[in-house]
């Protein structure tokens, strides 16, 4: 079977019409927004839940981390199925499940029930980021890839902002459990609208695995995983992204509680201030993606070098803010600056992954990135910080976690060695619209 070629430097076109592509982006962005609204609304509710249910910081962190663990566990098989069947229909099912699960959280009456409902939210969200990113990467020209993926994943930051703000405001007026129901409904509406998004045709996996024989599902999975695991750039890029997300998820999850405890502000005001930091991350994610795209034109490895430097800058800023400065406006200003820098990996590293992955495995390759980000990054950060907080205090915990930025930088430097050769290995392979 002839495999059409992917958009390359000489054929940098939209896969579908511009209107269809941008509609797909808008819908995919909107669902990513509510994905993270539903995921992060809980962090602004921590002070209320701690008071009502007498929960430890470790237990509170577990309510955030459980979603990431489930997403990491189910993300790869869900993305593999989406790659073989329909990305659009898969997204509709995912959004419906996580929205209904979020609404269910409203009716829980103890920690165990809420923990189970949050796990179900994660089951619905599993694979969405990778499938949505694969769709965007395929419908748009390569020259826009980092910027659009940065914007798409910035929806995670914007959703976190909205979740924190909505959670704090709703909890102060109607009680903290009402917040879960309020944020779950819009996702159901977007899931219905997503049926109008145009997919791209599934590429024959036999070409991707260089085999013309019929394969069993087990063989297909083994071949796919083997090929992805052998991609050195993918492995190191995923590792670096995970290390940086330990820092990001810790700040996102625990900043409202930090401001409430150490700056002495009310829970709803702490939520608004924390939302400003997350918003800075959303803006930074888009800006860094655009700047890295421009700086790396014709110099692919520079993309990873810039991101490594920004990870080190993030570490330095947060070490100074939480480790050296007293609580006050100056400390908060430095935290906002750190929030702006810390989302530097989002667009560029996603673009790196898509640059080195065969089109037949884009959603699956993105799921590997998502698995690393969720299991080794997003799941670790909130729980580790909560555990350290119970032992050493929240301020000390937040001064230690930024050290993971050094590990992130080292991983990206290592990925630079193989990036260009891995990218050339899949150059010239194209997909077509469905």
Describe the role of every protein-language-model region.
Residues 54, 86, 107-113, 124, ...:
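Helix-breaking motifs and short loop linkers at transmembrane-helix boundaries and internal kinks
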Residues 96-109, 312-326:
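C-terminal ends and interior cores of transmembrane alpha-helices
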Residues 10-17, 201-238:
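Juxtamembrane intracellular "pre-TM" segments in multi-pass secondary transporters
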Residues 152-202:
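Helix-loop-helix hairpin linking two adjacent transmembrane segments in secondary transporters
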Residues 117-157:
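Cytoplasmic helix-loop-helix junction between adjacent transmembrane helices
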Residues 42-43, 232-286, 346, 350, ...:
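Extracytoplasmic gate region of multi-pass secondary transporters
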Residues 84-95, 294-310:
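Cytoplasmic membrane-interface "Motif A"-like loop-to-helix N-cap segments
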């Amino acid at each position: 079977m002839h495999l059409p070629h992917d958009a390359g430097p000489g054929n940098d076109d939209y896969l579908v019409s511009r209107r269809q592509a941008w509609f797909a982006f808008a819908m995919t962005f909107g669902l990513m927004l509510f994905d993270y609204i539903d995921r992060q609304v809980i962090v602004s509710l921590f002070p209320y839940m701690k008071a009502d249910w007498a929960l430890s910081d470790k237990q509170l962190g577990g309510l955030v981390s459980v979603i990431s663990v489930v997403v990491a566990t189910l993300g790869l098989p869900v993305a593999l199925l989406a790659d073989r069947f329909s990305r659009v229909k898969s997204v509709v099912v995912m959004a419906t499940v996580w929205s209904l699960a979020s609404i269910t959280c409203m009716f829980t009456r103890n920690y165990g029930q809420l923990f189970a409902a949050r796990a179900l939210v994660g089951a619905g969200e599993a694979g969405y980021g990778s499938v949505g990113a694969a769709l965007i990467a395929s419908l748009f020209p390569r020259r826009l890839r980092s910027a659009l993926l940065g914007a798409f994943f910035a929806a995670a930051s914007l959703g976190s902002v909205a979740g924190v703000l909505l959670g704090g405001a709703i909890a102060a007026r109607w009680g903290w459990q009402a917040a879960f129901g309020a944020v779950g409904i819009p996702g159901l509406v977007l899931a219905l609208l997503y049926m109008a998004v145009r997919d791209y045709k599934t590429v024959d996996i036999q070409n991707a695995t260089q085999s013309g024989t019929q394969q069993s599902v087990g063989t297909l999975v083994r071949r796919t995983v083997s090929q992805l695991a052998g991609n050195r750039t993918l492995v190191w890029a995923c590792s670096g992204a995970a290390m940086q997300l330990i820092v990001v998820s810790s700040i996102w999850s625990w900043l409202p509680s930090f401001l409430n405890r150490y700056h002495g502000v009310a829970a709803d005001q702490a939520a608004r201030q924390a939302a400003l930091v997350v918003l800075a991350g959303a803006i930074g994610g888009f800006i860094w993606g655009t700047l890295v795209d421009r700086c790396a034109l014709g110099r692919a490895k520079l993309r990873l070098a810039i991101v490594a430097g920004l990870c080190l800058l993030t570490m330095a800023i947060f070490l100074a803010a939480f480790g050296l400065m007293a609580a006050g406006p100056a400390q908060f200003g430095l935290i906002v600056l750190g929030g702006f820098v810390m989302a530097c990996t989002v667009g560029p590293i996603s673009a790196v992954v898509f640059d080195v992955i065969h089109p037949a495995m884009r959603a699956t390759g993105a799921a590997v990135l998502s698995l690393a980000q969720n299991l080794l990054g997003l799941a670790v950060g909130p729980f580790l910080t909560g555990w350290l907080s119970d032992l050493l205090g929240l301020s000390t915990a937040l001064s230690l976690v930024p050290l993971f930025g050094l590990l992130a930088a080292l991983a990206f430097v290592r990925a630079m060695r193989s990036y260009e050769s891995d990218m050339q290995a899949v150059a010239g392979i194209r997909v077509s619209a469905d």
